[in-house]
Amino acid sequence: MASTDDPAGQRPSRAEAIVAHAEQSISEDAIVAAARERAVDIGAGAVTPAVGALLSVLARLTEAKAVVEVGTGAGVSGLWLLSGMREDGVLTTIDVEPEHQRIAKQAFIEAGIGPSRTRLISGRAQEVLTRLADESYDLVFIDGDPADQPQFVVEGVRLLRPGGAIVVHRAALGGRAGDAAANDAEVSAVREAARLIAEDERLTPVLVPLGDGLLVAARD
């Protein structure tokens, strides 16, 4: 009898196998793993290991000194971002849940990250982003409510310095964003965010099939 790879008796598609291999190839240290466990405990989303590793690579490639993150969670993505940033880099991370930020702050302390390297802002990202300075950030990571992605993208692009990059997580919505039959409000918002990026001549975008889809765009 031929072996199968899931309880339903169906082998994963080639694309699924590649993504699974990408995820399994990343090992997380004990501090990130502990933060991931806390994220589960408090019901906060957390990027997958491969998404985290890509964030670290992008931070390194952009030589990021100033990074903005929408959606602190338990600090998993923040730890990955900080691992790729310059040693004097500062992560500004925004979340509407103060408890999430308290837990993330503990993760940063456990990782030996000094308080001068993080700026945790509790509040609605829609409001906080508007108060940040134009063209002052090397990398913007958006991991907030997909329904708010268009506004986050508009503000995020405004914050980017030339040569910086914007990363939008949950750009695929489990495949619904590419399903012509799907047209609910969340899908429409994600498509609008993608359109805004695609039509901005300063940006060079690519959709990366990791996590729930990462829309990455570099600014000229």
From Swiss-Prot:
UniProt keyword terms in alphabetical order: Methyltransferase, S-adenosyl-L-methionine, Transferase
Listed EC numbers: 2.1.1.-
Leader peptide range in chain numbering: none
Pfam families attached to this UniProt entry: Methyltransf_3
GO biological process terms on file: methylation
Annotated coiled-coil segments of the chain: none
InterPro entries found in the cross-reference section: Cation-dep_OMT, SAM-dependent_MTases_sf, SAM_O-MeTrfase
Residues bound to substrate: D143
The keyword Methyltransferase is annotated on this UniProt entry: yes
GO-annotated molecular function: O-methyltransferase activity; S-adenosylmethionine-dependent methyltransferase activity
Binding site for S-adenosyl-L-methionine: V47, E69, G71, T72, S77, D95, V96, D145
The keyword S-adenosyl-L-methionine is annotated on this UniProt entry: yes
Family: Belongs to the class I-like SAM-binding methyltransferase superfamily. Cation-dependent O-methyltransferase family.
Protein name: Putative O-methyltransferase Mjls_4009
Phylogenetic lineage: Bacteria, Bacillati, Actinomycetota, Actinomycetes, Mycobacteriales
